[in-house]
Amino acid sequence: PIEVLKGSPVNAATPEEHPDWADPVSGETETKPTPVVDLPLGATEDRVVGALDIERALTRGEKAFEPGLLARANRGYLYIDEVNLLEDHIVDLLLDVAQSGENVIEREGLSIRHDARFVLVGSGNPEEGELRPQLLDRFGLSVEVKSPNDIEERIEVIRRRAAFEADKSAFLDKWLAEDAKIRAAILTARDKLGTITVPDEALRDCAQLCVAIGSDGLRGELTLLRTAKALAAFEGADVLERDHLRRVASMALSHRLRRDPLDEAGSTARVMRKGLLTVRSSLEGGRHMGCCGVGG
C-alpha cells in the first residue's frame, strides 16, 4: 500500500507533488493499494497520456485535462499483456516517459506535465513477434516461463487449480499464512537492503560479465547489482556474494544479450556460459569473492 493525497489523480504523496492543473486537495492523506494499471493493446494515445476533458469543455466551457493511464500508474505498476504486439507510437511514448519519469502533454492548447514513475511489467509470446530493443532494455528483469516437465509437479498444479475452482475462499484461506510469511520476509528485506555490503570484486564481476555478453550501456550492470542486493537482503545476508550474482544473472542480462545467429543455445544458457568463463578468468587473476562461481 501507498500513502496518497485524497483526490489526487496522480497518487501524489505530498502537496508539492500534486499537479497545478488538478483540482485542489485538502492535504489529507489516505492509504490505498499500490496501483496496478493494465495498458490494453488497443489503447489510444489519448487514453495512455491523457487528453482534453471534452465533457467539461462542452458543459462548462472550461479547458481541463483528463488524466490517462500513466497518471493512474504513477508510484505503481503498468502492466502490458502481449507487449511485443504494442503499436510503435505507443512504444515511443512509453520510452520517453520511462526515460524522464514525467509525462508531458502539449496539444489542443494544453501544456500539462505530471510525474509518471512506475514499474513496467510485460508479458508476451516471442513466437508472435519480437519486442523492440529500445523497449526491451527498459525492462529490468526477464524470465522465460515454460510448462513443467516433471509429472508430479504437473499433477500438483492440476490439483491446486481444481481446488481453487471448487472453492476459491477456502483455497485462499489455506495459503493465507504462507502469503503472510512471504510478505513479512519482503518487508524485512526492504529494511535491510541499505545495509548490504558490496565488495569491489562484486562491481568488477558485474562489469566483466556485461562486457563479456556485449551489453550496451551500463543498465545491465546496475540491474544485476540491484537484483543481487535484493536477493542477499531477502536471504538475510550481510555481504553480497558471487553466488547472489550467479543466481540472478540470467534474469538481469538474458534480454540484453546480443544475438548470435550461429549459436542455437537459449539466451539464459549463453549468459550462464559467459558468466562461467568470466569468473574463471577472475579467479585465475587472483581475485575471489564469495563461495560459488557464476554459472557453477
Q: Which residues fall in each region the model found?
A:
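Non-catalytic alpha-helical coupling and interface elements of nucleotide-dependent molecular machines
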Residues: 1, 10, 53-54, 75, ...
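Conserved ASCE/P-loop NTPase catalytic core
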Residues: 1-150
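Conserved AAA+ ATPase core "coupling" helix
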Residues: 45-50, 131-190
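Alpha-helical scaffold segments in soluble metabolic enzymes
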Residues: 47, 93, 157, 205-208, ...
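Short, surface-exposed helix-loop/turn micro-motifs enriched in polar/charged residues
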Residues: 86, 110-112, 131, 198, ...
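Non-catalytic, well-ordered alpha-helical scaffold segments
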Residues: 92, 133, 137, 200, ...
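Conserved AAA+ ATPase small/helical "lid" subdomain
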Residues: 169-224
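C-terminal engagement/docking regions of AAA+ P-loop ATPases
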Residues: 207-219, 230-296
